[in-house]
């Protein structure tokens, strides 16, 4: 009899599992939801929320998803921002059903041995991921993530004496990786231990050590050495593309993410011995992998990164509220550290304790003698921006052409101007103009951030200051126009979103309170009087989460 009871209990449990985990989810209407609330920037530069179809994976992203499953990434990484205290402040907006419309199977996972990846898309550049999969502990020292070096193509190449500098020796392994097109040189910047990364392979690899910091800029440093040259396989490119896709069906949510909206220009950080000592420890754990132990921007994974990490020994900083040529304020450094630098390998560090952020800034200031010899000039005053109107945007477009912004950034703002390919920073490394259509502004996505950049310039780059050549009003107009180039576009691809004119008009309406959160997202399919009303996102947990979560 006991065996019969046990058998019946087993069958009942199996049936219950099939019902709860198989049949009920299919029956729930939310399981067929293909839309999610998406943050979009309207033409006025404001971030509004709208219900929008989730986009499917591209072929490379699908390949990457299969690699993600095969390599067991989902064993440690979850893909679900839970509706509990603190999750939305740490990771981003709470997950919605529609985000997973194209996931077969779902990879929600339950364990978080590694970080949750729901919102990892566009947090850092592709190049950061290339470095991370090759040498995880050089990027995140306390990680337990293993290396995935079988996802790279590799060649060991001896160096030979060239006419003026070392050159790559002949190698069949190298020819198996690169096409050796004569009109497409691919510069290689080796790390101190002889590792060189190439993101592209359709061209001719060329060793370039002249721009590296001393002593690695000297030919004799490399004489007789053998380099390890690595390039990503199609599987790794797909894995990175899949990773960058995660969370982007929620659009430009980072521009409305409170922890990254820090605005500060003036603060004073004590340069005490204890502060510097603490900063040295933080720097060694969080920064040295990219910026190098000496702060020269030549860390062990710097070869993977484009743009290159900042060389702190030069005392030149891009993102400042001080005039061109001046050192930044402590507040500028704190803002950059907290926000990160979008679409580069510099992540946001808003989760790092404030004491650690303050301390590492004090330590970074020990790398260059400029900090002992000079004081930052006073920060520029940035008031409230003028209202953005169609007339102001039209004026900004005219000024954009007159100021020859298109020479670098292109007429459509895609970063494809005629001068773009030849641009170099002060260290002679290639540097790409920003693609405005994707809204990934390195100094921040608010019109004040763009105005600050227009006024101060970006030291160490070809981006000049327009403080003397343009009036305040002209700089505000260009800033508003540049911001509008990313209106109603996908931040991942820069492609226009499928929103009709009526929906765009409602999102452009100058009413700051409407459509300002996922809970109040515009539903283009609803009648106009109900379009921005709260909508229950998780119907079957109403009693726990509340209406409209």
Regions found by a protein language model. Give the residues of each.
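Hydrophobic membrane-insertion alpha-helices, especially the h-region
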Residues: 7-22
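Inter-heme linker and motif-flanking segments adjacent to c-type heme-binding CXXCH motifs
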Residues: 246-253, 272, 296-298, 343-349, ...
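Sequence/structural segment immediately N-terminal to covalent heme-attachment motifs in c-type
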Residues: 56-79, 93-96, 273-293, 388-414, ...
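Extracytoplasmic electron-transfer domains, predominantly the class I c-type cytochrome c fold
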Residues: 54, 58-61, 86-226, 230-233, ...
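Electrostatic cytochrome c docking/interface patches
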Residues: 36-69, 83-84, 115, 226, ...
